[in-house]
Amino acid sequence: MSHDAPTSSDRLGALVQTDDGRYALRFERRLPRPATRAWQALTDPDRLAAWFPAVVAWDLRPGAELRFDPTPEQRRRYGLTDQDATFGRITEVDPPHLLEHTWGAETLRWELHDDDAGTCLLVFTNTFDDRGTAAPAGAGWHAGLEVLEAQVDDRPVDWSPFDRAEALSARYETLAD
């Protein structure tokens, strides 16, 4: 049985301009498990390694500093090094429902809302200054969230989120226009 990368890209992220002139890329995903299970996929370093676009060890305390290092795949594909590390800070945390942090000048907000059916809604928002960030960020987060969804549902992932992001990139180009 093959577990190919998802082919449906009908759940594209939406881009809006914020009141302060920045841009917010927002995704919603219904996850088949409760927030406690999704929280593990968001915060466990081993699970993050499969989908998050950096190596990061969370210190889940408000104000904690974060370091985002290139992944092994980014080092291989794009020649990134330790010199390409970036930094951020935890701004809000309420396990297992809310994680917000900065990553350089960007803000990433992960909200998990449980429902009565034992599932949860993930609302992810990436806020940034440059509209040109929307296309590559949108394709990358879309692909990463597909891996996160599979992890939460205990489905195997035998596709590359990097390849998947490349396949989605044309769908996201319109966001940067």
Which residues does each predicted region cover?
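Hydrophobic pocket/interface hotspot
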Residues: 38-39, 48, 66, 90, ...
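Beta-strand/loop substructures that line and gate deep hydrophobic ligand-binding cavities in soluble
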Residues: 3, 98-150
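A short, structured loop/turn motif at beta-sheet edges
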Residues: 35-36, 60-61, 91-96, 112-121
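Short, highly charged C-terminal tails/helix-capping segments
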Residues: 152-177
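Hydrophobic ligand-binding cavity/cleft-lining segments
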Residues: 1-57
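Intrinsic-disorder/low-complexity, polar/charged segments enriched in Ser/Thr/Lys/Arg/Asp/Glu/Gln
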Residues: 22-28, 65, 85, 98, ...
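Hydrophobic/aromatic beta-strand elements that line small-molecule binding cavities or substrate pockets
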Residues: 29, 55-56, 86-92, 107-114
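Short beta-edge strand/loop motif at the mouth of beta-sheet-based domains
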Residues: 26-27, 45-83, 160-167
